[in-house]
Amino acid sequence: MPQVLMGNTRLHAPLEDGIPLIENDENSSQNEVDLYDYVSMSSYGGDNDFLISSAGGNITPENRPSFSAHVVLFAISALVIKPVCCFIFLNHYVITGSYDFAVAGGVCTVLYYMRLALTAWFMFRNIQSDMLPLNVWQQFVIGCMALGRTVAFMVVSYTTLFIRSELFFSMLAPNAGREYITPIIAHKLMPLISVRSAVCLVIISTAVYAADAICDTIGFTLPRMWMCILMRSSSVKRS
């Protein structure tokens, strides 16, 4: 009589009345072990493991991980642009005693580095727990930090540049080009700097820092908002 193995039982072919006979067979456990060994060993194809290796996969160069320009721009922004702008703001504070840009730039920069550290900590904990790098509330907190620092710096910059207008008066003064001051770090090649040049550097640094902050905020929030819109629209279509 033909037999079929199912678990620890042996299923006989149906009889004439259509009712199969099932009998226990303790010796069938050895057959199960042999079957498991066969399945495990069949996953290996010579030197390639088809279950855990992508050696046999045909991945095009466009889909392979690459060192993108975004990484370079991020390094320039975090390690060059922000420190240089803060240095110019500090130099302006030492020269004029006006601390608006120095405080705003310093606080926003410290908040930026805190946001990077918090993001890295969130990602480390989540990946360690086998979860997505950032969940919803973590993305909300990081997005609020990015948006808050940008708005704060923009408000301080607008108030200082266009409402008080002290910088423009200092730059357009008749003697501004002939008055020289000592920069915060004096050098043999540049022992003195004119007031007009110092004010121009502050205005340029303010514009660069504001543009960098806006791009940083857009780069974090816009892709996530767009993905949320796409997911919601796809769920509405399915329903």
Swiss-Prot record:
The record, for Pfam families, names:
Herpes_UL20
Bilayer topology term = Multi-pass membrane protein
GO BP annotations, alphabetical order: viral life cycle
Would the keyword Transmembrane helix turn up in this protein's UniProt record?
yes
Subunit notes for this chain?
Interacts with gK (via N-terminus); this interaction plays a role in the coordinate transport of UL20 and gK to the trans-Golgi network (TGN), and is required for their cell surface expression. Interacts with gB.
User: What family does the database annotate?
Assistant: Belongs to the alphaherpesvirinae UL20 family.
- The protein, known as: Protein UL20 homolog
